Amino acid sequence: SGTTGLPKGGSHVHGAVLAHYATGKYVQDLQPNDIYWCTADPGWVTGTSYGMFAPWSNGVTSLIYEGGFSASKWFELIQRHRVTVWYTAPTAIRLLMKAGVAIPQRFDLSSLRYAMSVGEPLNPEGVVWGLEAFGLPFHDNWWQTETGAIMIANYPSMEVRPGSMGRPIPGVEMGIVDEHFDPVPPG
Protein backbone atom coordinates (compact mmCIF):
# COMPACT_ATOMS: atom_id res chain seq x y z
CA SER A 1 0.00 0.00 0.00
CA GLY A 2 1.28 3.48 -0.76
CA THR A 3 -1.40 5.57 0.91
CA THR A 4 0.98 7.34 3.28
CA GLY A 5 4.28 7.05 1.46
CA LEU A 6 6.11 4.94 -1.06
CA PRO A 7 4.33 1.74 -2.09
CA LYS A 8 4.95 -1.25 0.16
CA GLY A 9 4.19 -4.81 -0.81
CA GLY A 10 1.14 -6.43 0.73
CA SER A 11 0.97 -10.22 0.96
CA HIS A 12 -2.40 -11.95 0.85
CA VAL A 13 -2.97 -15.66 1.22
CA HIS A 14 -4.71 -17.64 -1.50
CA GLY A 15 -7.60 -18.29 0.88
CA ALA A 16 -8.42 -14.57 0.78
CA VAL A 17 -10.61 -15.33 -2.23
CA LEU A 18 -13.08 -16.84 0.26
CA ALA A 19 -13.41 -13.42 1.91
CA HIS A 20 -13.82 -11.80 -1.51
CA TYR A 21 -16.51 -14.34 -2.38
CA ALA A 22 -18.41 -13.82 0.90
CA THR A 23 -18.21 -10.02 0.88
CA GLY A 24 -19.04 -9.97 -2.82
CA LYS A 25 -22.15 -12.02 -2.11
CA TYR A 26 -23.34 -10.48 1.15
CA VAL A 27 -21.96 -6.91 1.13
CA GLN A 28 -21.94 -6.20 -2.60
CA ASP A 29 -25.05 -8.35 -3.16
CA LEU A 30 -23.61 -9.88 -6.33
CA GLN A 31 -26.15 -12.06 -8.15
CA PRO A 32 -25.53 -14.43 -11.11
CA ASN A 33 -27.23 -12.14 -13.65
CA ASP A 34 -25.48 -8.94 -12.55
CA ILE A 35 -23.27 -6.77 -14.69
CA TYR A 36 -20.71 -5.43 -12.22
CA TRP A 37 -18.41 -2.45 -12.64
CA CYS A 38 -15.56 -1.70 -10.25
CA THR A 39 -13.87 1.46 -11.51
CA ALA A 40 -10.61 0.81 -9.63
CA ASP A 41 -7.47 0.19 -11.64
CA PRO A 42 -6.14 -3.39 -11.22
CA GLY A 43 -2.86 -1.87 -10.00
CA TRP A 44 -4.66 -1.07 -6.73
CA VAL A 45 -5.85 -3.70 -4.27
CA THR A 46 -9.51 -2.78 -4.88
CA GLY A 47 -9.02 -3.41 -8.59
CA THR A 48 -7.86 -6.96 -7.96
CA SER A 49 -9.83 -7.94 -4.84
CA TYR A 50 -13.14 -6.42 -5.94
CA GLY A 51 -12.54 -5.71 -9.62
CA MET A 52 -11.61 -9.34 -10.32
CA PHE A 53 -11.75 -11.85 -7.46
CA ALA A 54 -15.14 -10.99 -5.90
CA PRO A 55 -17.12 -10.96 -9.15
CA TRP A 56 -15.30 -13.93 -10.66
CA SER A 57 -15.76 -16.09 -7.55
CA ASN A 58 -19.48 -15.20 -7.58
CA GLY A 59 -19.86 -15.99 -11.29
CA VAL A 60 -20.70 -12.39 -12.18
CA THR A 61 -19.96 -10.59 -15.45
CA SER A 62 -17.59 -7.64 -15.00
CA LEU A 63 -17.28 -4.51 -17.09
CA ILE A 64 -13.64 -3.58 -17.67
CA TYR A 65 -13.00 -0.04 -18.91
CA GLU A 66 -9.48 1.18 -19.62
CA GLY A 67 -10.29 4.73 -20.74
CA GLY A 68 -9.97 7.95 -18.80
CA PHE A 69 -12.53 9.67 -16.66
CA SER A 70 -15.47 11.46 -18.25
CA ALA A 71 -18.83 11.80 -16.50
CA SER A 72 -20.73 11.42 -19.78
CA LYS A 73 -18.64 8.40 -20.81
CA TRP A 74 -19.11 6.66 -17.46
CA PHE A 75 -22.89 7.09 -17.53
CA GLU A 76 -22.96 6.01 -21.18
CA LEU A 77 -21.11 2.81 -20.19
CA ILE A 78 -23.62 2.09 -17.41
CA GLN A 79 -26.46 2.60 -19.89
CA ARG A 80 -24.93 0.62 -22.79
CA HIS A 81 -23.78 -2.36 -20.70
CA ARG A 82 -26.79 -2.32 -18.34
CA VAL A 83 -24.56 -2.22 -15.25
CA THR A 84 -26.48 -3.39 -12.18
CA VAL A 85 -23.85 -3.07 -9.41
CA TRP A 86 -21.32 -0.22 -9.39
CA TYR A 87 -18.30 0.11 -7.07
CA THR A 88 -16.36 3.37 -7.28
CA ALA A 89 -14.29 5.81 -5.22
CA PRO A 90 -15.43 8.96 -3.43
CA THR A 91 -12.98 10.98 -5.55
CA ALA A 92 -14.81 9.79 -8.67
CA ILE A 93 -18.17 10.54 -7.04
CA ARG A 94 -17.04 14.09 -6.27
CA LEU A 95 -15.95 14.53 -9.90
CA LEU A 96 -19.33 13.20 -11.05
CA MET A 97 -21.05 15.60 -8.65
CA LYS A 98 -19.36 18.53 -10.42
CA ALA A 99 -21.32 17.52 -13.53
CA GLY A 100 -24.53 18.03 -11.57
CA VAL A 101 -27.65 15.92 -11.94
CA ALA A 102 -28.43 16.93 -15.54
CA ILE A 103 -25.78 14.70 -17.14
CA PRO A 104 -26.73 11.41 -15.43
CA GLN A 105 -30.40 12.16 -16.03
CA ARG A 106 -29.75 12.18 -19.80
CA PHE A 107 -29.00 8.46 -19.60
CA ASP A 108 -31.11 5.40 -18.86
CA LEU A 109 -29.54 4.21 -15.61
CA SER A 110 -32.53 2.10 -14.59
CA SER A 111 -30.41 -1.07 -14.67
CA LEU A 112 -28.48 0.13 -11.58
CA ARG A 113 -29.76 -1.51 -8.43
CA TYR A 114 -26.81 -0.97 -6.09
CA ALA A 115 -24.00 1.61 -5.87
CA MET A 116 -21.06 1.52 -3.45
CA SER A 117 -17.98 3.55 -2.63
CA VAL A 118 -14.58 2.64 -1.22
CA GLY A 119 -11.05 3.91 -0.82
CA GLU A 120 -11.48 7.03 1.31
CA PRO A 121 -14.23 8.63 3.37
CA LEU A 122 -17.41 9.36 1.42
CA ASN A 123 -18.79 12.78 2.29
CA PRO A 124 -22.53 12.88 3.10
CA GLU A 125 -23.16 15.04 0.02
CA GLY A 126 -22.04 12.14 -2.19
CA VAL A 127 -24.71 9.86 -0.73
CA VAL A 128 -27.39 12.51 -1.25
CA TRP A 129 -26.17 13.30 -4.77
CA GLY A 130 -26.57 9.64 -5.78
CA LEU A 131 -30.20 9.77 -4.68
CA GLU A 132 -30.81 12.98 -6.61
CA ALA A 133 -28.90 11.97 -9.75
CA PHE A 134 -30.14 8.41 -10.26
CA GLY A 135 -32.29 7.42 -7.31
CA LEU A 136 -29.73 5.34 -5.39
CA PRO A 137 -27.57 6.25 -2.41
CA PHE A 138 -23.92 5.22 -2.45
CA HIS A 139 -23.32 2.55 0.21
CA ASP A 140 -19.94 3.30 1.74
CA ASN A 141 -17.68 0.58 3.10
CA TRP A 142 -14.25 0.36 4.67
CA TRP A 143 -11.25 -1.88 4.40
CA GLN A 144 -7.58 -1.48 3.56
CA THR A 145 -4.81 -3.30 1.78
CA GLU A 146 -3.69 -4.90 5.04
CA THR A 147 -7.12 -6.38 5.83
CA GLY A 148 -7.49 -7.76 2.31
CA ALA A 149 -11.30 -7.59 2.25
CA ILE A 150 -14.23 -5.42 3.31
CA MET A 151 -14.44 -5.08 7.11
CA ILE A 152 -17.20 -2.48 7.68
CA ALA A 153 -20.08 -1.82 5.32
CA ASN A 154 -23.46 -0.33 4.66
CA TYR A 155 -25.23 -3.55 3.67
CA PRO A 156 -27.79 -3.60 0.86
CA SER A 157 -30.56 -4.08 3.44
CA MET A 158 -29.50 -1.04 5.47
CA GLU A 159 -30.94 2.42 5.18
CA VAL A 160 -27.85 4.49 4.45
CA ARG A 161 -27.11 7.30 6.89
CA PRO A 162 -25.04 9.88 5.01
CA GLY A 163 -21.62 10.04 6.66
CA SER A 164 -21.73 6.52 8.11
CA MET A 165 -19.50 3.74 6.82
CA GLY A 166 -21.90 1.13 8.22
CA ARG A 167 -21.44 -1.83 10.53
CA PRO A 168 -18.77 -4.53 10.87
CA ILE A 169 -19.19 -7.69 8.85
CA PRO A 170 -19.76 -10.92 10.82
CA GLY A 171 -16.59 -11.96 12.63
CA VAL A 172 -15.13 -8.44 12.80
CA GLU A 173 -15.08 -6.57 16.08
CA MET A 174 -14.67 -2.83 16.00
CA GLY A 175 -14.39 -0.10 18.56
CA ILE A 176 -12.82 3.21 19.40
CA VAL A 177 -9.78 3.31 21.67
CA ASP A 178 -7.95 6.10 23.46
CA GLU A 179 -4.24 6.92 23.27
CA HIS A 180 -3.52 3.93 25.57
CA PHE A 181 -5.56 1.58 23.35
CA ASP A 182 -8.26 1.27 26.00
CA PRO A 183 -11.84 1.05 24.67
CA VAL A 184 -13.81 4.29 24.81
CA PRO A 185 -17.51 4.00 25.72
CA PRO A 186 -20.14 5.24 23.23
CA GLY A 187 -21.04 8.90 23.37
What are these regions (language model features)?
Residues 9-10, 37-38, 62-65, 87, ...:
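Short catalytic-loop micro-motif centered on adjacent basic/acidic residues
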Residues 57, 83-88, 97-160, 173, ...:
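Gly/Ser/Thr-rich phosphate-binding loop
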Residues 15-35, 42-85, 98-99:
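Conserved AMP-binding/adenylation subdomain of ANL enzymes
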Residues 1-18:
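Conserved AMP-binding A3 loop
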Residues 1, 40, 148:
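Active-site beta-alpha turn of Rossmann-fold NAD(P)-dependent dehydrogenases/reductases
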Residues 11, 18-22, 26-28, 32, ...:
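Ligand-binding pocket scaffold of soluble enzyme catalytic domains
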Residues 168-171, 182-187:
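Conserved ATP/PPi-binding loop(s) of AMP-dependent carboxylate-activating enzymes
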Residues 4, 178-181:
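Residue-level recognition of short loop/turn positions
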